[in-house]
Amino acid sequence: MSGFKCYLQLGDRLSQIWLNKYTLVLLLAMLKLLFFSKSIQHAIEVSETYILSNCYSIDSLYSKMTDNTPHYLGIMGNYLIEKGMEETVKATLETLSLIVYASEGLVNFAIDLYLGTYACLIVSAVDGTVDVATNITEKLISLVNDTVSSVANELDTGLNDISKIINKVIKAASKVENFFTGDDDDSNMTSSIKSVNLTISALHNLYIPSSINDKLEELSAKTPDFAQVKNTTKNLISVPFNEVRKNIKAVNASNIIGDTSVLYVPPVSLDNSTGICSSNQSEILAFYSILGHVLKIATVVCITVLICFAVGAMAPVAWNEIKLWRRLCGMRDHYMLSRQDSYTSFSSENTHELKDPFRDPPIQNGQYDVIASYQQCFQTWNTRIAGWMTNLVTFGKSPENIDPKTKQKIEWVVAYMTSERALCVLGIGLLGILVCICQFVMIALLKHKISHSLTSNDGDGVQNLLKSSTAVDIENQMSLWSVQTNKYINTTETNINQEVFGWINTTTLSVNNTVATMISDIDTTLADVFNGTLLYNPMKTVVGCAIENKLYTIEKAMTWIHDKAQLHIPRINGTQIKQALAKQTDNSTIPTASSTSAATENLLENLVNDMREGLLKILRAYHRITLGELTVALVILAVWLVQLPIALVILRLRLRKATFD
């Protein structure tokens, strides 16, 4: 037993190379691949079972999709046709109204162009003549009245002077006559002429009355102007056109398109004759059989490759162990040869006691081993675990009562079971067991939740949830479709108005600007030439009749074209479409609707039951997989426990060999 050590020798190390980390990883990968293959195989089987057990539901849904699609397409198509025809009639009536309005404008323009010009000139001539006569009369009356009054005043002044002279002459003659006759009787002829008073007071009352101007103004007021004549003519012409527009507005577009009930709507089919699943059941079975065969072959090939790599990984590990052991042995031999030169200065005078550099307590020379010190220094946890297990085995016994050889055997067996590779196996096994326990807890919680959540009562709630979810999804999709369609219509309408009618808008604006400039230039020219003269108003009237009225009419027509040259496309109303679908459903026969509802109820109930059963089946499958993983973890733990009999066998063989030696 002198050569027996408490640590593992090269042979002991090589006996555990199959527990190296590379081989373990590859073996675990192989097991993971195997479990993954089983999981896929189970999923394929569940899928096959689900499809075969729900063939009726699949056939029913497919039949509804294929057989009932014409029904809903018919409803949608009829609605679009109805709205399209109605909007077409409305657009036609609007176009007809615009044509009538344009025709009225053209007639008015033609009348204004030919007859209106002459009527305007005639009326303007009368108005101008009256205005000129009125102005001349006013000036003549003012001149005559002012002149006669002035002349009368001057004549009165002159006659007063003459009257004074004559009165003086008469007075002197009277005095001479009295002197010669001496007669104071005033009864004679001369006495009768006391004085002379010459006046023209009648001329002060001579004037031309202003009633003549009033007569002319009354004549001017009674003379109709061109605007009145034009409005009267326009009102007379607009009577038939207004009647036509009134009749057009009174037309009801809904009555013109006819009775929409004659539009055919394909009925809802309740016959699940289109059996896409039932008719192809043999092909479905063959397909799943091929999938299982391919999966099995792929699994076998991958596992074989991983096993080969796992076995091949032992060779480099064994070679590394041999090289490490050689280095340790070389270090030990080198230490044994140089220990006296290295540690003589630290020994006593009578002995050559050596000190272990890796331990604090003093030991005997024969007890020190470099390899043991190396393991204690660089494999700390392995050494500690080995010490704990040794103390556990020798529990209750003092170190002095244990035979040193027995202690070495125990330490060697513990070292064999707590080697780096053996502890790796132990850790993997314990970790696998812990993970499996966690998986069992999770599966139990999920199974409890499913069993108590998807009961019959809650199943109705799930069905209602599915119904409401389906209805909300359909409504959202319909709203999204209408919004996107309206966006497309908006873009198309904008492009048409810009690309097709854009040049019309540009042209009308340009023409209106040109007309406004021409009218402004004409008015400026007339003001520069005739302003302040009697000819300004007549010339302005003549130019207005001949030119400006036509320009104003053109400007008004261009503005009308600019406002009306716009395309308005009707928009999609999702609410009306939904109401049309609901109305069509209400108008359907009651047995058909109730049968469809009952079939839908059955489908939803089957869906809930299949959901519950499918979830439980998946949990059962994962329970089986977890059991397999737990078995693998226990096997790995058993592999570590197998190290004990292997260590005992090796120890037995080594002791027998030492006995023979």
Swiss-Prot record:
Organism superkingdom: Eukaryota
Residues passing through the membrane, by range: 17-37, 106-126, 297-317, 425-445, 630-650
Regions of this protein lying in the Cytoplasmic compartment: 38-105, 318-424, 651-661
Residue positions with a glycan: N135, N145, N188, N197, N231, N252, N272, N280, N490, N505, N512, N531, N573, N587
One GO CC term, this protein: plasma membrane
Membrane topology category: Multi-pass membrane protein
Keywords on record: Cell membrane, Conjugation, Glycoprotein, Membrane, Transmembrane, Transmembrane helix
Extracellular topological domain: 1-16, 127-296, 446-629
One annotated GO biological process: plasma membrane fusion involved in cytogamy
Keyword tRNA-binding attached: no
Job of this protein: Involved in cell fusion during mating by stabilizing the plasma membrane fusion event.
Family statement drawn from the similarity comment of this UniProt entry: Belongs to the PRM1 family.
Gene induction: By pheromones during mating, through the regulation by the STE12 transcription factor. Also induced in respiratory-deficient cells.
Keyword Isomerase tagged: no
Protein's recorded name: Plasma membrane fusion protein PRM1
Organism, scientific name: Saccharomyces cerevisiae (strain ATCC 204508 / S288c) (Baker's yeast)
Coiled coil location: none
